Amino acid sequence: MSHSQRTYDLLIKLLLIGDSGVGKSCLLLRFCEDQFTPSFITTIGIDFKIRTIDIGNQRVKLQVWDTAGQERFRTITTAYYRGAMGILLVYDVTDEKSFNNIENWYQNVQSYANEGVELILVGNKCDLDEKRVVSTEQGQALADKFGIPFLEASSKTNINVEECFYSVATRIRDTVAKTKGNESGSGGINIAEGEENSASKCC
């Protein structure tokens, strides 16, 4: 493939999951377009955005999928677990129910996602300290229970948003590098090829 056709070394599909209203779409918008919209419309079904980043000496193209958190869309979104190399489990630090439901989202990951998928727990809206009901310690304890990394973030004030995505992408890149090192002569990794133009977009 010529350089003009492919301007990245690795294509990674990431998934944002969590209850409706926890700010998944805002995290996506902040990371991919460096924007924040407080009146963001609820995602209907599936949306995704693209951002290409540099990790070490590699160009990594991130295809970040935003899934609807409502129960009525659950059957639609389960198909999108397949092929995801990394998943961000997102809750709202001002909404205890969204935190408690992370257990259910984690079980979905265990049921539907590929084996070896990289995970991170994200406590969103950490700028709203006066409304906080879930402590940092609670978030860390849950992440420790799952054996996954944990960060608190804010799309509004742009706290740790980059770190959330880079953390997952870097671990995936490292895993792919090890795999390719063990499989000399293997082809490049290209996840979700052909899906870039197939998403159902929403406002």
UniProtKB/Swiss-Prot annotation:
Residues 181-203 are annotated as: Disordered. A motif (Effector region) lies at residues 40-48. GO terms for cellular component: endosome; plasma membrane. Its main location: membrane. GO terms for biological process: exocytosis; protein transport. The keyword Cell membrane applies. A lipid is attached at residues 202-203 (S-geranylgeranyl cysteine). Protein transport. Probably involved in vesicular traffic. This is Ras-like GTP-binding protein RYL1. It comes from Yarrowia lipolytica (strain CLIB 122 / E 150). The gene is RYL1.
